[in-house]
Amino acid sequence: MLVLGIETSCDETGVALYDTRRKLLGHALYSQVDMHRDYGGVVPELASRDHIRRVLPLVTQVLEQTNTSLETIDAIAYTQGPGLAGALLTGASISNALAFARNIPVLNIHHLEGHLLSPLLSDPAPDFPFVALLVSGGHTQLMHVKGIGQYKLLGETVDDAAGEAFDKTAKLLGLDYPGGKLLADLATQGQPGRFKLPRPMLNSDDLNFSFSGLKTAAALLINKQKANTQTRADIALAFEDAVTDVLVKKSIAALKITRLQQLVVAGGVGANSRLRQKLRHHLVGTGIAVFFPELEFCTDNGAMIALAGALRLQQLNEKPPGSDGSFTIKARWNLEDL
């Protein structure tokens, strides 16, 4: 079965085509980063308007790239939520219109489910069950993933998400938008051990996270020091070390509690090389396998939505009816409510 996936939850427009027999056939992505840079963050109204301009051309691009026609598509999967309401409405309306015109099923996909399943796009892929560390600009969660649609929350941030803390600290360091990747690049030039920042909730008796205090500590340190390039790099390294230390320790604790032997890391911060290195180092010789998405699938993308749609379609005893054209979005949506 061929599933077309459409992702428009925030500031990336993603389209992909997934075949349940031949895997991912093709995908295309348009990032709005340049448009939002002047504002220092995502402007929801601009994001939704740009999705309107981009979705259908990307659909055409993917169909041409894979030598496929819309008439051969068996279902359309789209991000129903969570995300920016206007952005979600764009993807939902276009997806349902296409499905209605073709009288094929439409599959409502949870954005975070797409991220959790994204490592399944790679080979080797994890088997169910596994622990998932979902870490991005909007979310920091540890999940027990038992199967498709079977997700149990183990722990989450009580304030800022890790990716949000990265971006805000990068801004304090004078880095451009989006700053998370730029902070990580700057940290590679840092001198280890010069500065020490707190590791909030590192030794708490739960699997929750907190990054607002770390962000404040970094801000105080930045204001206290002279703003030369080396000092900025040293602070960036200290901040990155603090965040990744907490993520690693909590992830290992989740593995011990669940007694599972597989860890999946997903979301934009999952691309961070220091996080990847630390997890691999700590898990060497433990028998625990760690899986990361390919770098292009760490950020929001259509491939993960097409995959999630295909896996959900395969779970059904019979093919669902074609879309009736009606739809809803869920700007806020708990993954455990699936």
From Swiss-Prot:
Gene Ontology terms describing biological process: tRNA threonylcarbamoyladenosine modification
Gene Ontology cellular component terms for the protein in this record: cytoplasm
InterPro entries: ATPase_NBD, Gcp-like_dom, KAE1/TsaD, TsaD
First-listed, main subcellular location of the protein, grouped into a coarse class: cytoplasm
Key word Metal-binding present: yes
SUPFAM superfamilies reported in the protein's UniProt record: Actin-like ATPase domain
One Pfam short name: TsaD
Catalytic activity annotation: L-threonylcarbamoyladenylate + adenosine(37) in tRNA = N(6)-L-threonylcarbamoyladenosine(37) in tRNA + AMP + H(+)
Subcellular location: Cytoplasm
EC number: 2.3.1.234
Domain of life: Bacteria
Binding site for Fe cation: 111, 115, 300
Cofactor remark from the record: Binds 1 Fe(2+) ion per subunit.
The protein's required cofactors: Fe(2+)
Keyword annotations: Acyltransferase, Cytoplasm, Iron, Metal-binding, Transferase, tRNA processing
MF (Gene Ontology): iron ion binding; N(6)-L-threonylcarbamoyladenine synthase activity
Record function comment: Required for the formation of a threonylcarbamoyl group on adenosine at position 37 (t(6)A37) in tRNAs that read codons beginning with adenine. Is involved in the transfer of the threonylcarbamoyl moiety of threonylcarbamoyl-AMP (TC-AMP) to the N6 group of A37, together with TsaE and TsaB. TsaD likely plays a direct catalytic role in this reaction.
PANTHER family, per the entry: TRNA N6-ADENOSINE THREONYLCARBAMOYLTRANSFERASE, TRNA N6-ADENOSINE THREONYLCARBAMOYLTRANSFERASE, MITOCHONDRIAL
Protein name: tRNA N6-adenosine threonylcarbamoyltransferase
Organism: Nitrosomonas eutropha (strain DSM 101675 / C91 / Nm57)
